[in-house]
Swiss-Prot record:
EC number: 1.14.15.9
Name of the protein in question: Spheroidene monooxygenase
Coiled-coil boundaries: none
Disruption phenotype annotation: The mutant, when grown photosynthetically and chemoheterotrophically, produces hydroxyspheroidene, hydroxyneurosporene, spheroidene and spirilloxanthin, but does not produce ketocarotenoids.
Membrane-crossing residue ranges in chain numbering: none
Cofactors that this protein relies on: heme
Family as reported in the entry's similarity comment: Belongs to the CrtA family.
Region of interest (Disordered), residue spans: 1-26
GO BP terms, alphabetized: carotenoid biosynthetic process
Residues making up the signal peptide according to the UniProt record: none
Amino acid sequence: MTNELSNAAGASQQGPAASSFSADTPPRTTAGGDVLVLLLIDVAPAARLWGYGRFVAGTTPALGEPGARFAKQLGTGYEGGFGLRPSATRQGLFVLFEDEAAADAFIGRSELVQTYRRNARELCIVKARPYSARGSWDGQKLRVGSPAPVDGPVAALTRASIRPSQAHRFWPNAGPSQDSLERAAGCRLAVGLGEAPFLRQATFSVWDSVAAMDAYARTGAHQRAIVASRDFFSESMFVRFVPLSIEGVWKGRRYG
């Protein structure tokens, strides 16, 4: 998504290599608010039919989990990237829980998550709590329940429904900004996600700090994309999170 970081900023006050991310001393949080669990999977070759079946099943299995209040089954761009070419094996499951206890039970004891583990070539699980949010996703708004972090890692989500009449203008402007995101200093994880080809897209990224994320938001490619993106979206949502835990492997990099 082209205008992820500047809009997310406005929502607040204005042997793979290992990641340094650690949740041994998670940030302090206030009671209440949603907790996100994001599953990122690269489906094993022997489990391709199971992987395709995730889109047939949709969000029904996830919404049957205790405490789950909103869910989206998502595809990704090729190799987890941001282009128009879809990936045949990489996908995501986005689930919002009413509290952290429900999120932890889902990660630790859910048969759905265990099924993901059994069928994965790679699996990365992110747990995070929003500290600022603007906009909606299919009419749903995130409940904020965490203070803004003083330091440490942050995550950002942007999603949008692209107006069909503007898709031909959106995608040429999206490419340079999104390609630069993966290479940006301080970006630990970045993935392009989507509900529907071309028109319902999202980006999720994790950063070393707010400063690193804001520095990327001021880069030339990103700023040009922001200017070009006006009036592209019929609905959008921009969220910043405090990451509570990241564990697993994504695109060859180990987290946790």
